[in-house]
């Protein structure tokens, strides 16, 4: 699993209300949620994002309310990966369950600036900043979690597994 794109860096303690404000929770449609991604942080933020770009967060990314809409909004905005110093635990599980790759890098997040061109190799846990040449190493994503991501999240994974087992 390799991803490459422009880094869109946000700060510490970005909560789920900033990622997708409550007024947009009337749908679960990824595209509609994606159109309003980070609207609680800055109006029109998502207009800078191109499909395949990568969100970069600070400490405690995804804190606040537990809502599946937040990772869906990030995916709907075209960003398949979030690299952060750290994640709120419930967001971390929700992210993988919705098919969003999340990588914790601690203080090495400071090696990535807004607008940098970065490449992520989830299997090896290596993130390369192609703008500066810096390399960040994090724990590789376990195979079981990569399987969740490969199938689009927990629900598609369970459906596929049940179909295999029950024919």
Curated annotation (Swiss-Prot):
Domain of life of the native organism: Bacteria
Listed GO biological process terms: L-leucine biosynthetic process
Keywords: Amino-acid biosynthesis, Branched-chain amino acid biosynthesis, Leucine biosynthesis, Lyase
Classification via SUPFAM superfamilies: LeuD/IlvD-like
UniProt-listed InterPro entries: Aconitase/3IPM_dehydase_swvl, AconitaseA/IPMdHydase_ssu_swvl, IPMI_Swivel, LeuD, LeuD_type2/HacB/DmdB
Molecular function in Gene Ontology: 3-isopropylmalate dehydratase activity
CDD domains for this protein: IPMI_Swivel (cd01577)
Major enzyme class: lyase
Protein EC: 4.2.1.33
Recorded catalytic activity of this chain's protein: (2R,3S)-3-isopropylmalate = (2S)-2-isopropylmalate
One Pfam family hit: Aconitase_C
Annotated transmembrane regions: none
Pathway(s) where this gene product acts: Amino-acid biosynthesis; L-leucine biosynthesis; L-leucine from 3-methyl-2-oxobutanoate: step 2/4
Recorded family membership: Belongs to the LeuD family. LeuD type 2 subfamily.
Role of this protein: Catalyzes the isomerization between 2-isopropylmalate and 3-isopropylmalate, via the formation of 2-isopropylmaleate.
Record's subunit section: Heterodimer of LeuC and LeuD.
Protein's name according to its UniProt entry: 3-isopropylmalate dehydratase small subunit
Native organism taxonomy: Bacteria, Pseudomonadati, Thermodesulfobacteriota, Desulfovibrionia, Desulfovibrionales
């Amino acid at each position: 699993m390799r991803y490459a794109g422009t880094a869109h860096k946000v700060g510490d303690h970005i909560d789920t209300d900033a990622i997708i404000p409550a007024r947009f929770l009337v749908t679960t449609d990824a595209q509609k949620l994606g159109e309003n991604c980070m609207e609680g942080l800055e109006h029109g933020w998502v207009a800078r994002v191109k499909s395949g770009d990568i969100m970069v967060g600070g400490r405690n990314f995804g804190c606040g309310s537990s809502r599946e809409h937040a990772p869906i909004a990030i995916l709907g905005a075209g960003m398949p990966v979030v690299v952060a110093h750290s994640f709120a635990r419930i967001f971390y599980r929700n992210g993988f369950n919705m098919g969003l790759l999340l990588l914790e890098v601690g203080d090495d997040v400071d090696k990535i600036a807004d607008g940098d061109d970065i490449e992520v190799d989830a299997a090896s846990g290596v993130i390369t900043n192609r703008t500066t040449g810096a390399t960040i190493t994090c724990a590789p994503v376990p195979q079981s979690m990569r399987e969740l991501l490969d199938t689009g999240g927990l629900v598609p994974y369970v459906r596929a597994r049940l179909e295999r087992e029950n024919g």
